[in-house]
Curated annotation (Swiss-Prot):
Its cofactor is Zn(2+). GO terms for molecular function: metallopeptidase activity; tripeptide aminopeptidase activity; zinc ion binding. It holds the Pfam family M20_dimer. Keywords: Aminopeptidase, Cytoplasm, Hydrolase, Metal-binding, Metalloprotease, Protease, Zinc. This is Peptidase T. Signal peptide: none annotated. Its EC number is 3.4.11.4. Zn(2+) 2 binds at residues 142, 177, 381. InterPro entries: ArgE/DapE_CS, Bact_exopeptidase_dim_dom, Peptidase_M20, Peptidase_M20_dimer, Peptidase_M20B. Binds 2 Zn(2+) ions per subunit.
Length: 412
């Protein structure tokens, strides 16, 4: 199984599929189609039914039930796009077999080293086979490891018809990394009772709580005048923006928060004297605190208007997704079952809140409860990204055993 996982992830990772938040199309980038078409062909060759890709790049397929009694239809999803934070062009995955510990030189000429000194969790992977980057790109295990695990699990079930399972629906989706993964997802057409995203991180992650999320763009308008004659005339939009940022709570930022603590994250700053734009993401697990964060943003904008003039500042803010716990709690057995499966495989479930979101965050509010399962990866979205092939195999086994367990329970 490991050989198949390596082969698939190597192939998928080399296909550039970065999304683009500035685009208005779905998928946001044409290159996502390259992997979508590859997967469509692969699923057809495996012998799945109902293999269809719609005009927006959502690829659906079915593994029919192999039992003669009713079992819930279960979905498994992963996203084809990779993050925009770091380049995903010309990905060249490296394989470290039977990692012996210590530093991993990703790129000697650029002196890029993956070291336990910087990433102490590496010490827990001694003896594992790791797939890393070459130090110049991200790897894309988020979420191509999830794709590889789903396809490999389905291939295994097809080769082992003695393993009982109900109907399985598969979906590979675009644009998750820019928050639009489910925007054009047809839940009725997918037709599953519930689903799981294979989009988590280290071994054992099992998540059904996510952030409430909003995005905000604050635009400041200045007045540019030659510096030599600027007294009492120039208004520097960058200084207006800096003062605005400094009014937000300094300790409520990603680098100073953890667990259930929310934050304001300034993730874009672009400007000159005449015009400056700040891009924020706003996050909190608690709905009331989330609303309070948005209210603070609106309050500060109002203050700036009163102090500097209506024309000096604009705010665009919109909700992106909500904490899926509210929709999953009523069907919590879909989480508990996977936790039981993990324990049966000797994996300790790590049921923790996601400090982020998955496609499941939105899908759960669209009527498809969708918790999130680990894939085995670490350090997503950068050149130090890597994945344990051993833990990819365990994630694949979790898929297989989850389907077996639901089939057995339906028979009881």
């Amino acid at each position: 199984m490991q050989a198949k996982l390596i082969e698939r992830l190597m192939t998928y990772a080399k296909i550039d599929t970065q999304s683009d938040f500035t685009s208005t199309t779905t998928p946001s980038t044409a290159k996502q189609w390259d992997l979508i078409r590859h997967l469509e062909k692969e699923l057809k060759e495996l012998g799945l039914t109902d293999v269809e890709t719609d005009e927006y790049g959502y690829l659906f397929a079915t593994l029919p039930s192999n039992v003669d009694y009713d079992v819930p239809t279960i979905g498994f999803l992963a996203h084809v796009d990779t993050a925009t934070d770091f380049t995903g062009t010309n990905v060249s995955p490296q394989l470290v077999e039977h990692y012996e510990g210590g530093d991993i030189v990703l790129n000697e000429s650029l002196n890029v080293v993956l070291s336990p000194k910087d990433f102490p969790e590496l010490d827990g992977y001694v003896g594992h086979t790791l797939m890393t980057t070459d130090g110049t790109t991200l790897l894309g295990a988020d979420d191509k490891a999830g794709i590889a695990e789903i396809v490999t699990a389905i291939e295994y079930l097809l080769a082992h018809p003695e393993i009982p399972h109900g109907p399985v629906r598969i979906a590979f989706t675009p644009d998750e990394e820019i928050g639009r993964g489910p925007h054009k997802f047809d839940v009725a057409r997918f037709n599953a009772d519930f689903a799981y995203t294979m989009d988590g991180g280290p071994l054992g992650e099992l998540q059904y709580e996510s952030f409430n999320a909003a995005g905000a763009t604050v635009t400041f308008h200045g007045t540019n005048v030659h510096p030599g004659s600027a007294k009492n005339k120039m208004v520097n939009s960058m200084k207006l923006a800096m003062a605005f940022q400094n009014r937000l709570p300094a300790d409520e930022a990603p680098e100073r928060t953890s667990n259930y603590e929310g934050f304001f994250h300034l993730n874009g700053f672009n400007g000159d004297v005449e015009k400056t734009t700040l891009q924020y993401i706003i996050r909190d697990h608690d709905k009331q605190k989330f609303e309070a964060r948005k209210a603070l943003m609106e309050k500060l904008v109002l203050e700036w208007k009163q102090k500097y003039g209506e024309e000096r500042i604009e705010l665009q803010m919109e909700d992106q997704y909500y904490n899926m716990a509210e929709k999953i709690e009523p069907v919590k057995h879909i989480v508990d079952t996977v936790a039981d499966v993990m324990r049966g495989l000797g994996i300790e479930p790590k049921i923790e809140p996601i400090r982020g979101g998955t496609d499941g965050s939105q899908l759960s509010y669209m009527g498809l409860p969708t918790p999130n399962i680990f894939t085995g990866g670490e350090n997503y979205h950068g050149k130090f990204e890597y994945v344990s092939v051993n833990n990819m195999e365990k994630a694949t086994t979790v898929i297989i055993e989850t389907l077996r367990t639901f089939a057995k329970r339906a028979q009881a």
